[in-house]
Amino acid sequence: MRAVIQKTVGAKVDVVSEAGTETCGKIDGGFVVLLGVTHSDTEKDARYIADKIAHLRVFEDEAGKLNLSLKDVGGAVLLVSQFTLYADAASGRRPSFSQAAPAEQAQRLYLRTAELLRGHGIHVETGRFRTHMQVSLCNDGPVTILLDSFMTRISPKMKVVPD
């Protein structure tokens, strides 16, 4: 599971259709998280990503150090599904998305990640799965962090959330 985490002072996601544009998620401050799911992802990956998002210390304390977490500052998450995080553009000019999980699996783990974040006491707004969306945000910092739960399987230094 891959997550691109962007610290924001405000963000929204709109669903665009023939009927028009509808805002389906909006936050005042916290993180915009673009979340991609691959074939081998499980509940364990969702737990790892949710735990990292909740506890990443990238907000400034009184001394100006990045020492506070999303939970510490009462921030929210705008969670947006993003299968293109598993694009492979190594050959040719059109990316392959074969590493992205099938829609049913991806949606289940996307919703589970949102549920796990809520379990941490974090307010979560979401995009709408399998729709055309437009994400607007005002980056803060900017701070952008890439997480990949696969790294926990190949690096002994990475901490894994216990079962």
From Swiss-Prot:
Function (record text): An aminoacyl-tRNA editing enzyme that deacylates mischarged D-aminoacyl-tRNAs. Also deacylates mischarged glycyl-tRNA(Ala), protecting cells against glycine mischarging by AlaRS. Acts via tRNA-based rather than protein-based catalysis; rejects L-amino acids rather than detecting D-amino acids in the active site. By recycling D-aminoacyl-tRNA to D-amino acids and free tRNA molecules, this enzyme counteracts the toxicity associated with the formation of D-aminoacyl-tRNA entities in vivo and helps enforce protein L-homochirality.
Coiled-coil stretches: none
Known catalytic reactions: glycyl-tRNA(Ala) + H2O = tRNA(Ala) + glycine + H(+); a D-aminoacyl-tRNA + H2O = a tRNA + a D-alpha-amino acid + H(+)
Keyword field contains Transferase: no
Record NCBIfam families: D-aminoacyl-tRNA deacylase
EC supergroup of this enzyme: hydrolase
Pfam families: Tyr_Deacylase (PF02580)
Protein name, as recorded: D-aminoacyl-tRNA deacylase
One GO cellular component term noted in the UniProt record for this chain: cytoplasm
Keywords: Cytoplasm, Hydrolase, RNA-binding, tRNA-binding
Native source organism of the sequence: Neisseria gonorrhoeae (strain ATCC 700825 / FA 1090)
Residues spanning the membrane: none
EC assignment: 3.1.1.96
Gene: dtd
Main location: cytoplasm
Domain notes: A Gly-cisPro motif from one monomer fits into the active site of the other monomer to allow specific chiral rejection of L-amino acids.
Extent of motif Gly-cisPro motif, important for rejection of L-amino acids: 141-142
GO molecular-function terms, A-Z: D-tyrosyl-tRNA(Tyr) deacylase activity; Gly-tRNA(Ala) deacylase activity; Ser(Gly)-tRNA(Ala) hydrolase activity; tRNA binding
